[in-house]
Amino acid sequence: MGPLAPILQEYFTAYAVTQRAMSGATIRAYRDTWRLFLAFLSNATQVPAHQLQLAHITPADVVAFLDHLERGRRNGVATRNLRLAAIKSVMAFHASKSPDYLEVIARINAIPVKKGPKPQMTFLTGAEAQALLDAIPTDTWTGRRDRAMFTLAIQTGLRLSEITSLQAADLHLGAAAHVACTGKGRKNRTTPLTIATTTALRTYLHERTTRPGHALFPGPRGDALSADAVQQRLKVHVTRAAASSPGLVGKHVTVHTLRHTAAMRFLEAGIDSAVIALWLGHESIATTSVYLHADMNLKRAALDRTRQPDSPAGDYHPDDPLLAWLQSL
């Protein structure tokens, strides 16, 4: 059945890059999966990683590795499923080259993803979003950069990776102002900008031209801010904003929260889910439907729109004390 080393070398140097055109982030995630998996197999079989054979991999080994990730490394369900996808991808790639191993590969590819609890989606209200922006000091270069960056994030809903990869040339602030980015799956898209965002970015861009590098939001040396740096800057400003906006106290806010915030604004305005999916760069409308479950006010509004003509608007509140007690359970 052959050694694993040449299989992995061909997969990562040729197939993933040339045939699949995977993004750098996906390749790194898959690479890290196989580094962990090989170390796990090597420890279990007492065979050095470079000497492992395809025959050393069984469905039971894969399941044991996934359980090890959850129990030993405290990884969540999402990480477990990502690691499983990386293993399946390599196995599927090699299936046509190892016909005598097809049954085992099929059993590995049949291992189901694990369902986990879906966390409550977090987003900012309009007041909280404004409090966040107002809390960012603009008496320093970094403060002005951060305000421009998070103004863009809240209005456009760009992903963190999309924000950090933006170049100054990606901004088009003339007629029909927009920002161009390369999103998930290397898909290019353009996102229109509001007048307020355009004005903020035009002011920022004028100052940005005096700085080195081409990144739209650079660090001190002109290189693009890292994802961790952006999250840390956001954390600092959220903490400051919480002093004037109690709703932010204890709320875990990330750049993805700002993406959710942009989506919820559209939903509250009655924009169709298909349009929101296009705006956010979602491949499927099903991905966007998660926002429909996020806001209780939207649910109440939907209930009011569908009530019987002779029914009053609002939620049902039982008058009977026993019913009230049962409802409170």
Language-model features, listed with the residues they occupy:
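Conserved catalytic core of the tyrosine transesterase superfamily
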Residues: 1-329
